[in-house]
Every structure is written in C-alpha cells, then in structure tokens.
Swiss-Prot record:
<keyword id="KW-0539">Nucleus</keyword>
<keyword id="KW-0238">DNA-binding</keyword>
<dbReference type="GO" id="GO:0005634">
    <property type="term" value="C:nucleus"/>
</dbReference>
<feature type="region of interest" description="Disordered">
    <location>
        <begin position="115"/>
        <end position="142"/>
    </location>
</feature>
<dbReference type="InterPro" id="IPR050655">
    <property type="entry name" value="Plant_B3_domain"/>
</dbReference>
<protein>
    <recommendedName>
        <fullName>B3 domain-containing protein At5g57720</fullName>
    </recommendedName>
</protein>
<keyword id="KW-0805">Transcription regulation</keyword>
<keyword id="KW-0804">Transcription</keyword>
<feature type="DNA-binding region" description="TF-B3">
    <location>
        <begin position="11"/>
        <end position="105"/>
    </location>
</feature>
<dbReference type="InterPro" id="IPR003340">
    <property type="entry name" value="B3_DNA-bd"/>
</dbReference>
<dbReference type="GO" id="GO:0003677">
    <property type="term" value="F:DNA binding"/>
</dbReference>
<feature type="compositionally biased region" description="Acidic residues">
    <location>
        <begin position="119"/>
        <end position="129"/>
    </location>
</feature>
<dbReference type="Pfam" id="PF02362">
    <property type="entry name" value="B3"/>
</dbReference>
<dbReference type="InterPro" id="IPR015300">
    <property type="entry name" value="DNA-bd_pseudobarrel_sf"/>
</dbReference>
Length: 300
C-alpha cells in the first residue's frame, strides 16, 4: 500500500540533530538496516515537503554502520538545522527519504523571502513626529490570533487566553532552554527519542500523524501549516481527542494558517504528562474531515 505522500509504509525513524555529531554525516539507526536493498546504492536522495531534493552518499562501514556523508553538509546548511531539531525520515524502500523537520514541537516552515521597502526621508520625519507606540501596536495587530466563533459568549474569555498561549508558544519553548535543568530535560528527551519508531504507537500505521512535545503551552494543541498541507487536512468546528481514558470533544480554532485545538490541558492532567514527554498525535478522518485525534504519550 502507498501512503498519501507517495511512499510505501516502511516505518519512519526519528533523529535528533546534534551539531557536534551530525554536522558532517548522519548515522542511521542500526535497527533500520533490514529495510535497505542489497547491494546498497551509492547515493540516496533526501526530499523535503517543498519538493526540493539533495543527493547524498550512502556509505557502509565494516561494522555494518550505515550513514549519509557527502552531500549531507549541504542538506544541513540549506535547511538551517540547529541543535534539537527533530528529523523524521520516511523511506521509500529503494534510495529516497522524505524528510520532515520539526523545531520547538512544530514542523519547520519554509523561510519567506524578505521584502525590502524603501522609505523616503519625508516618511522618516513623519514617523518620527508621530506616536512612538504606533509601530509597536501595528506589529501586535498583525500577529493577533483570530479564533472561530463557536459556542456561547461566556467561552470567549477562555479562548482569548488560549489564543495568547498560541502566540507565545514558540517563545516559551526557547526560554525553557535557559536553565541547566532545562538542558538536562531536553537531553533526556533527545536520548529517548533517538530510537523511537512512531508507527509502533499508532492504532493504524497508515494513519497520518504529527509529533508534539510537552514543552509548549498546555492549554492548546497547535497543528502547523505544513502538517495540514502535507496531509490535506480539513476540519469542522469540533474534534474528538482520544486517549487511554476515553474521549473528549474539543473546539477547533484558526490562527492565521494554523489550526488550534482548545482545552488541551485536560489530556495533560489525566495522563500525568511531564516536561520532556513526547506526544504522537494520530489523525483519524471520516469522509476527508478530521473527526478524531488519537493521542499517544511517550514518557521520557
């Protein structure tokens, strides 16, 4: 059977990028050796969701350690990989890998080109005479989150808080790395994730999924644009969250081109989620609409 991305259902493998170990070459988990063709092709192809591809040299040591070498440095540079990026590899059974990059619990999105606007001296003087807070307020307005108008008006306050959580989610993740305790937590999480095959946790290995972490806001679950694009996801006003305790119906909202699911914190509480735990979200659709998300918690 072929998945929606065009690849047969070989299990994915996950690598946590470490600039000290993975900048020049990438060692592939030994447990994955069983899936490679024999003899091993000289080159492999890495593809990203935007359609770009990189040719890399496939090497095999005397200790039967398989790695990606020549060409890997360019892949690292072109994608701007940094420490603790999650690299999720989907193999086609021949010589190609579809690579998805996650950062701070969200898929890494393409960098938009910078637009430069020329401003005349007159405009500078005009802005200088105006309210010094005007520009700051404009930036805030551009980054405001627009939620779906669902439910009664007495729920608006909660949703506003959730929207704020969405906006600061990435910053919270970055800030959590400032302490020694935070670095140790991430190290434990990275070590535990290095050997994870996400499909073994899924109810149906053919279902699409995405990976979240417990380091983001506990009030909302964010589904990034790239996940929505990769799997062609469509949502109604609500979705069912399923775990080992049962099912919760939650409201769905929109933030720009992302989707957020509100009141996510109850899943954390009843599953006793701790900092550094990894969350695999399995998407279940009915008639091309996401009806449920089955949540699998991988303890650190």
């Amino acid at each position: 059977m072929v998945l929606e991305n065009g690849f047969p259902p070989y299990p994915d493998f996950l690598k946590i990028f470490n600039s000290h170990e993975d900048s020049q070459l990438l060692v592939i988990p030994r447990s994955y050796n069983r899936y490679y063709p024999n003899p091993l092709p000289q080159t492999a192809v890495l593809k990203n969701p935007e359609g770009r591809f990189w040719n890399v040299q496939w090497t095999k040591s005397q200790e039967v350690i398989i790695s990606l070498q020549e060409g890997w440095v360019k892949f690292v540079k072109d994608n701007g990989l940094i420490d603790r990026d999650f690299l999720l590899f989907t193999y086609d059974g021949s010589r190609s890998f579809w690579v998805r990059i996650h950062r701070n619990g969200l898929p890494l999105e393409p960098t938009a080109p910078i637009k430069i606007q020329e401003i005349s001296d007159d405009e500078d003087e005009t802005n200088g005479d105006g309210d010094p807070h005007m520009e700051e307020e404009g930036d805030t307005d551009e980054n405001m989150i627009v939620s779906l108008s669902l439910g009664s008006s007495d729920e608006v306050g909660d949703d506003d808080d959730d929207d704020y959580d969405t906006a600061i989610c990435d910053e919270v993740n970055k800030a959590s790395g400032s302490s020694k305790k935070g670095r140790v937590t991430r190290k434990h999480r990275d070590d535990s994730l290095a050997s994870i095959t996400p499909q073994i946790f899924l109810a149906d290995p053919n279902n699409p999924f995405f990976i979240s972490t417990s380091s983001c806001s506990r009030r909302i679950l964010v589904i990034a644009r790239q996940v929505i694009k990769d799997y062609g996801l469509n949502f109604d006003g609500t979705v069912n969250l399923i775990d080992g305790f049962g099912e919760l119906t939650r409201k769905v909202g929109k933030w720009k081109d992302r989707v957020v699911i509100y009141k996510w914190n109850e899943m954390f509480t009843r599953n006793k989620v701790k900092q550094g735990d990894v969350i695999i979200c399995e998407i279940i659709r009915e008639e091309d609409v996401v009806r449920s998300i089955k949540v699998h918690f991988v303890k650190n």
